[in-house]
Amino acid sequence: MEYHCVLFTVLLQLIIQPGRSRPTITPEGPRLTVPLYSNFSLHCQSNSTVRWQHENRPMRTLKEEQRQGQQTILKVNRAGPQHLGKYSCREEKTGEKSSIYVYVKDPENPFRRTIVFDIVAAEGDTTVIPCLATDPDMKNLNLQKCDGQPLPNSLRYSASLETGVSVEKVRKEFEGCYVCVGTLDAATVKSGRYQLTVRLVPDAPPPITLGQPQRVLLTQGEKLSLSCSTSNVNSDIAVKWKAPNGVNPSVHQNSHLLTEPITHVRTAILSLSSVTMQDAGNYSCEAINEKGTTAKPVWVNIYEKGFINITSVDNSTRRVRAGESLSLRVVMNAYPKPHTFSWSYSGVKLTNTTDHVITSRTHGNSYTSELKLVRLKVSESGIYTFSCLNRDATIRQTFEVHVISKPQIVSYEGPIDGQVRCVAEGYPTPQIKWYYCDLPHSRCSNLLNATQEEEDVVTVTMTNPPFGKGAVESRLNITKNNYATLECVASANGEIVYTLFSISENTVPHELFTPLLIGFVAAAVILVLILIVLTYKYMQKPKYQIQWKVIEGIHGNNYVYIDPTQLPYDHQWEFPRDKLRFGKTLGSGAFGKVVEATAYGMSKADTVMTVAVKMLKPSAHATEKEALMSELKVLSYLGNHINIVNLLGACTVGGPTLVITEYCCFGDLLNFLRRRRVYFYYTTLGEDAYYRNVMMQSEPNDSRNGYMTMKPSVLGILSSENRRSLNKGDSYSDSDAVSEILQEDGLTLDTEDLLSFSYQVAKGMDFLASKNCIHRDLAARNILLTQGRVAKICDFGLARDITTDSNYVVKGNARLPVKWMSPESIFECVYTFESDVWSYGILLWEIFSLGSSPYPGMPVDSKFYKMIKEGYRMESPEFSPSEMYDIMHSCWDADPVKRPSFSKIVEKIEQQISDSTKHIYLNFSSRLPAAPGPREESSSHVHRLNSVGSHSTATQPLLSSNDVFLDRSSPSHPVV
């Protein structure tokens, strides 16, 4: 049948409407029916090149003609069963396509003829029975069993004339013969028979069974044979061996089938005819199925010759009471298998009897031999020897067995010539003591008023053999005393025997010294105990140590620290004590405190400056005093930097040591972040604030880790530029400074502030590293903020009581900030520049979590240490840009060498902060003189920022190079 008129009309419509994006197929409609062996044509109209597809496959066997213009014509001559199906016209550029389904009507075959009647489906999959109708008028297409039996209850399917019957979630019980049934012209028609076979699918990777232990021992020249088997519910399984590099074994495989249940078994056998030392290593058997891969290792050890190594042995010296039993055991590793196990006693080989029971056990290359000695006699004391031999080695292990016997008094006599004599024997050799009392025929040692005779006693050891009983003789001279009864007591190993001697005259011994001696000893013991307790309490007190360490030299991984006590101290730092007026305490520890103070004439006679003074408490000891002096020397050695708490002066003569440093009005960074949480505005890099963090609440246990809160919070909501700018006016007074501090503390906090804090701390740490100084306790609690939100690194040292600070955990005999420490510092006590970089990464996490505790919800216990060893790292905090988290993660590299230096970190953060922040920081830095020198005073253009600067040249070396001024004539810039 030809369709030229229809096609011509459609072509005219396409020419009139050329803007359509999808190709158009004519004849129109979803399907086309053509008689068997007739010709038909399909026209595709498109603005670009198209390709015809049949059943979603490219057309290769059918004629395809490309004509001029926008039309592609597909011509099919003598349409047969193979031409039935869906035809698609697909644009090559856009992938857009249109489709039409062609029925090739065959009166004799209502279903398309096919040669595929065996269908294999995986269990759980959806499979299609391809019974495609040749006539679109077929009705009621359904699926039936070939034998007329009902379908399985759980079988669910969908039927379509164009796609066939789709069976969902195939199960093993669906296996069988099926036929498609439909109605055509009121008659029932059936398709051919389809045999459905369901292939079982495993639910897990395959199991592996090794034919030998996982540790195989061989000597050079022997044959290696390793066997590995696996099984699977279907035949889609493979097993193979992996050998160490350079080893080329032969591998033989075989398989067999088990029927109930059906199981496919595969075995791989690896062989080496003659092994060498290079063949040793880790061999791995791998089994693979549809669910994955399973592997089991086999360690092959090659030795030049055989060996026997004892791995466990009972105590070689054994003591047992007579009549008890004793077991002697030896555990050893050996290869090849020992051919001789033997036990001997005093050189005589023992046989397996009821008195000497010998047992042996074998597990792989481990062998155990045990000798049980039943109801030992004293005469069986002596040396027992275990011997083991194999082809190449011999070992011997000896045991000394001592049989404990009760002491016995074997003879006694007297009194004769003013002496009594007592002889005892046993093992161990007994001890003899003499007691006397005034009661006749009584055991003196049981009486409360019994007296032990220690004078005029002569004791001689008669025999003391290495094994068996020893004998001892004791003689007592009684010429000087008169007794009613004498008692000879022999004791050994908790056993006691005695004999009594009756004396004719009775003289009660003098007991004057006994109570005095007891009282003296008791008093001495009490005094010693008190001294021990006091010493222990003193040793347990926390010792103040300066955390900052200055390195003298680096030799590989070994750092040589400078003894800070050996550093020089320049007395130009001295400041008169009477010019300090102390205020409130800013921080306090076990041995010291930091106090706010006012310094008069620090840089000029009429200047007044707010400073922080670190001092010791009266309870401090000499070690703490020396440590504070060391801290003073280290600060003077380091020099000044805008991002560390700089030294302003000191008082070391005429009283206790005072260290005068800059006063930071906003306290520590940790509590500053926690106070500002409710005013935090989250911003993306380079943008103004757009999100206010109103959901976060202050943590109930905010610790005062350093300075107490200086000023009340004042709510301020300004733009990111105005919020950072300082007030500028014609004059500047102390009330102006207080007002400015109150306003700035109340201002909002945004992401640019957090980046600024991170940048400043990195700059400060880079400075310390350039001075070969290691911090060892870098954390937000040890960062102080001053006016302009300038961050300064400090070491609280004695100003913090670490015994009450939960951030410091007892480890050994010290309290350490474990959650801030690198793995090498925790497990190896190694502190380096790289360990400071790790702590800096934790500090970044604190900053971008707005003061949260690191590793939230994780106590410092054995599980915590295990997770750190296994590489656990914290996830990105809530307000951290991805670039900053990348820096954190690089700081936490397990390999210290791969961690970035502080100079690299500074470069990375500089890429994130805004140009205005960089300009502010450079402005501050450029106004920080590099060396002491005179400075002209200009009251109209400069003003003081607390103790960060002064109005004129100071006599103190560091103070003169530590002044920071803001030029009132310069444009207003945000303060970092």
UniProtKB/Swiss-Prot annotation:
Binding positions for ATP per the UniProt entry: 587-594, 614, 662-668, 781
> Where does it sit, as one GO cellular component term?
receptor complex
Q: Which residues are glycosylated?
A: N39, N47, N282, N309, N315, N352, N449, N477
**Catalytic activity, reaction form:** L-tyrosyl-[protein] + ATP = O-phospho-L-tyrosyl-[protein] + ADP + H(+)
Expressing tissues: Expressed in cells of the neural crest-melanocyte lineage. In the embryo, also expressed in mesodermal cells that give rise to hematopoietic precursors, notochord, neural crest-derived cells of the branchial arches, pineal gland, retina and mechanoreceptive sensory cells of lateral line neuromasts. Not detected in primordial germ cells or larval gut.
Tell me which SMART domains the record gives: IG, IGc2, S_TKc, TyrKc
Range of residues in the leader sequence: 1-21
GO biological process terms, semicolon-separated: B cell differentiation; cell migration; developmental pigmentation; Fc receptor signaling pathway; gastro-intestinal system smooth muscle contraction; hematopoietic progenitor cell differentiation; Kit signaling pathway; melanocyte apoptotic process
According to the UniProt record, which cysteines are disulfide-bonded? Answer: C44-C89, C131-C180, C146-C177, C228-C285, C422-C488
What enzyme class is recorded for this protein? transferase
The chain's Extracellular topological domains, given as residue ranges, are: 22-515
* Primary location class: membrane
Cite the entry's keywords alphabetically: ATP-binding, Cell membrane, Differentiation, Disulfide bond, Glycoprotein, Immunoglobulin domain, Kinase, Magnesium, Membrane, Metal-binding, Nucleotide-binding, Phosphoprotein, Receptor, Repeat, Signal, Transferase, Transmembrane, Transmembrane helix, Tyrosine-protein kinase, Ubl conjugation
Output the Gene3D superfamilies linked to this UniProt entry: Immunoglobulins (2.60.40.10), Phosphorylase Kinase, domain 1 (3.30.200.20), Transferase(Phosphotransferase) domain 1 (1.10.510.10)
* Residue numbers on the Cytoplasmic membrane side: 537-976
- Transmembrane spans: 516-536
Pfam families for the chain? Ig_3, Ig_PDGFR_d4, PK_Tyr_Ser-Thr
Q: Where is the composition biased (Polar residues)?
A: 947-976
Domain Protein kinase intervals: 580-922
Checking InterPro entries in the record gives:
Ig-like_dom (IPR007110), Ig-like_dom_sf (IPR036179), Ig-like_fold (IPR013783), Ig_sub (IPR003599), Ig_sub2 (IPR003598), Kinase-like_dom_sf (IPR011009), Prot_kinase_dom (IPR000719), Protein_kinase_ATP_BS (IPR017441)
Molecular-function GO term, any one: ATP binding
Q: What happens when the gene is disrupted?
A: Defects in the number and distribution of melanocytes.
Family recorded in the similarity comment: Belongs to the protein kinase superfamily. Tyr protein kinase family. CSF-1/PDGF receptor subfamily.
PANTHER family referenced in this protein's UniProt entry, alphabetically = MAST_STEM CELL GROWTH FACTOR RECEPTOR KIT, TYROSINE-PROTEIN KINASE RECEPTOR
Protein task? Tyrosine-protein kinase that acts as a cell-surface receptor for the cytokine kitlg/scf and plays a role in the regulation of cell survival and proliferation, hematopoiesis, stem cell maintenance, gametogenesis, and in mast cell development, migration and function. Required for the migration of cells in the melanocyte lineage and the survival of embryonic melanocytes. Required for the differentiation of some, but not all, melanocytes. Not essential for hematopoiesis or primordial germ cell development.
Q: What is the name of this protein? A: Mast/stem cell growth factor receptor kita
The record lists the organism as Danio rerio
